[in-house]
Amino acid sequence: MIARLLSAPMLIAAFAILVGTCVDALVKGVAPGAGLHHLLAWRFLFGALLSLAVFLALRKPVPGWEAVRFHTLRGLLQLFCAFTFFYALTQLPLAVATTLGFTAALLVAPVARLLLGEKISPIAAGATLLGFAGVAFALSGQSGAGDGAGNQTLGLISLFSSTIGYAFVLVLLRMRALIEDATTIALFTNIVPALAMLPVTFGLFGAPDGRDLPVFALLGLLGYGVWYLATLAYGRAPAQRLAPLEYTSLVWSALLGLVFFDEMPGWQLWVGAVVIIAACLIVAFEGRFRTRREARLPASDLPE
């Protein structure tokens, strides 16, 4: 049964997205009372302990110094993305944060151009502009969030900072995913932020409420699971097959926001989300269609 599930990468990816959305909802509910710094420190500590245990149990080889330096940079960037995104979750409706988070996919092309020298096609550039037009329309229906308009402004600044950082994380991950396994990548994703947050863990900024520790442990478990499952799925199927599944998180976030936080997204958000998703799909599939055109193949593998 387990082998059959592991052979279904789309199912693995879909489940990872559902779990990730549940993590976002849990953070939104817990962070204001527990303290975001405590949540991050202990979430990554528990995630690091779990990922290290799996790494040792599977007897994975220790990466070389070059890989360690690379993953240290990526791990610190991951911590920045987690902090800014989690803060945004406390200030914005869950569905809004999820929708605007999709823009990270639109920023991958410019980041890949910067880091890898990849050329940005006119179609990708146009799709990026279309996506941010969708962002503007989605925000047009927002009258405020959190405790006031100031909180919404800070939330949006924090969220877009997170998406820019996450675009860098995705490109960096792509540079290593072909030569390293999911276990090693998941280990550094957790252990580097955990080490960086040790001053908080050791109580230099106050002690957390002991009743919150089980929740932090759950976040560490779920956070590790999301990264491991996602890396596992993307190692078994082309990214273009799995990428559209990312947008199912909007449905889950809207449902969880309504049930647990009494958040009802306006119609502008849904229209803007459709525009953003369409732009992301154009970016995701444009390279495939261009390659098939150059090879004089049909645009689709479906029978005509």
Feature-to-residue mapping (PLM):
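Cytoplasmic-side transmembrane-helix entry/capping segments in multi-pass membrane proteins
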Residues: P9-A14, E66-L76, I120-A133, G155-L156, ...
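Loop-to-transmembrane-helix transition segments
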Residues: S7-A16, F55, K60-T84, T153-S162, ...
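Transmembrane alpha-helices of multi-pass small-molecule transport proteins
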Residues: P9-I12, G33-F80, L130, G165-V169, ...
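C-terminal transmembrane-helix exit sites in multi-pass transporters
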Residues: A104-L129, V251-W270
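Helix-helix packing/entry segments at the starts of transmembrane helices
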Residues: A97-T103, R176-V192, W227-L258
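Hydrophobic transmembrane alpha-helices of multi-pass small-molecule transport proteins
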Residues: I123-Q142, Q268-G287
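Membrane-interface helix-cap regions at the ends of transmembrane helices
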Residues: A48-A67, V135-G148, V192-D212, L218, ...
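Transmembrane alpha-helical segments that form core, pore/gating elements
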Residues: S51, A145-F205, E294-E304
